[in-house]
Amino acid sequence: MKINIKGREVELKNTFRSMIIYEKVAGKTFNPQGITEILLYFYSVIMASDKDCELEFDDLLDMVDANPKLITDFSEWLNKSFRISNYLNGDVEKENENPKKA
């Protein structure tokens, strides 16, 4: 997912750096239970994806207020990112592993 921040295009990356930044900011591990956690993680992903980014959390809130679809797009991107990661780690059950009942 790409996002334009202050005239700069940033390619978002879901990395360990994002999780570490989130833990430092939130004081807990990432476990999205509400909009605050998702927005904090969105901010953390941006910071991890562009180390030179000069975005304050309040700026992100302004961006989302002006374009609420950003949070929907981010949530969809994040879900896809976690699914891919789980698949690559072998955490997803294969369809053929469960025998069909006769």
Where are the regions that the model predicts?
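Short, hydrophobic/amphipathic alpha-helical patches that form generic packing surfaces
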Residues: 37-48
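Charged interaction scaffolds used for protein-protein
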Residues: 4-6, 19, 28-33, 52-102
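Short, structural beta-strand-to-alpha-helix junction motif
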Residues: 14-26
